[in-house]
Design a protein with these regions (language model features):
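Conserved alpha/beta-hydrolase
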Residues: 80-101
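The alpha/beta-hydrolase serine catalytic core
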Residues: 6-14, 18-24, 34, 105, ...
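The serine-hydrolase catalytic nucleophile loop
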Residues: 67-80, 242
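Alpha/beta-hydrolase active-site loop
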Residues: 105-124
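N-terminal cap/lid segment of alpha/beta-hydrolase-fold proteins
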Residues: 2-54
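Glycine-rich "HGGG/HGxG" loop immediately N-terminal to the catalytic nucleophile
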Residues: 73, 95-108
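Short beta-strand element of the alpha/beta-hydrolase
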Residues: 57-66
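Primarily recognizes the serine-hydrolase "nucleophile elbow" in alpha/beta-hydrolase
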Residues: 120-182
Length: 283
């Protein structure tokens, strides 16, 4: 569910900003400042370039990282680079992560972070905004789409036009693997939260969920008719394959089980990222 296996977080305040990119602090509905970056499409696709056509732009892909990640981590920068060949890209650091304010609620209030990123993309003129989430981010984009997509959804400007969830859990409080037991220690114990803050630059809230948010499996049937793609590796050390199969059986969704793939953005190579981009933005 996170990048704990990658070791200590390294700050990248000198992360180069690509040509035409914009770095901005967004503000969520509950007042949390988010570090975010907008990158224009680098390819010459007329339908998705950042050149205005009648005052409008094409697709923007909003990328939601995993727990302990940030917009500056190499795996997210790689994803943004690949996605930008098809569309504009918005990356951001979830609350409590990287250069953003607040404290992580490990997937609960983070829905508001995705809302802020999607609304920013739409404010820049993008008529089609899609979301891609990894691990914790994968569960968040599912809940975001359930709350803001479909015929029953919330504000129109927060609505996603398609959703990709990579390496997401199907249910909360899962402790069936050693990595998830370690993660629960980080989240629930004072010593663990200290390790998260010092070792991974992740500030974690010390309160339990109240109420418990909609689970990813409960969210899936509420997403239709918004297109949904689920991606999961058959060597994921965090969540075994019963998780994606449970999600896929909950409602209309396409499922890709990737042979030899591990967990989340760190295991997503350029070939897979390119296929995801192609699913989101067909030629």
């Amino acid at each position: 569910m996170c990048a704990l296996e990658d070791g200590r977080y390294r700050s990248s305040s000198d992360t180069p900003i690509p040509p035409g990119a914009v770095r901005k602090i967004l503000r969520t509905a509950d007042g949390v400042p988010l570090d975010a970056m907008y990158e224009p499409c680098t390819a010459g696709f007329a339908q998705d370039s950042t050149v205005d056509h009648g005052g409008f732009r094409g697709t923007a892909i909003v990328v939601a990282h995993g727990f302990t990640g940030s917009l500056e981590r190499p795996a997210i920068r790689r994803a943004a680079r690949v996605f930008a060949r098809r569309a504009a890209v918005v990356t951001f650091s979830f609350r409590g992560h990287g250069g953003s304010g607040g404290r992580s609620t490990v997937g609960d209030r983070e829905v508001l972070d995705v809302v802020a990123a999607v609304e920013w993309a739409r404010s820049l003129g993008h008529t089609r905004v899609v979301t891609v989430g990894f691990s914790m981010g994968g569960s968040v984009v599912l809940r975001h789409a359930a709350l803001h997509g479909g015929p029953h959804g919330g504000r129109t400007e927060a609505k996603p036009d398609a959703v990709v969830s990579v390496s997401a859990p199907a249910r909360w409080y899962y402790r069936g693997t050693a990595p998830m037991r370690r993660l629960h220690w980080v989240v629930t114990r004072p010593a663990g939260r200290f390790v998260g803050r010092v070792g991974f630059r992740t500030r974690i809230h010390d309160r339990d969920w109240d109420p418990v948010p909609l689970s990813p499996t409960e969210a899936v049937p509420l997403i239709a008719p918004t297109p949904l793609l689920l991606v999961h590796g058959d060597r994921d050390p965090y969540f075994p394959l019963d998780h994606p199969h449970m999600l896929a059986s909950a409602g209309p969704a396409e499922l890709w089980v990737e042979r030899g793939m591990g967990h989340a953005e760190n295991a997503a190579d350029e070939a897979l990222l390119g296929r995801i981009a192609g699913w989101l933005v067909p030629e």
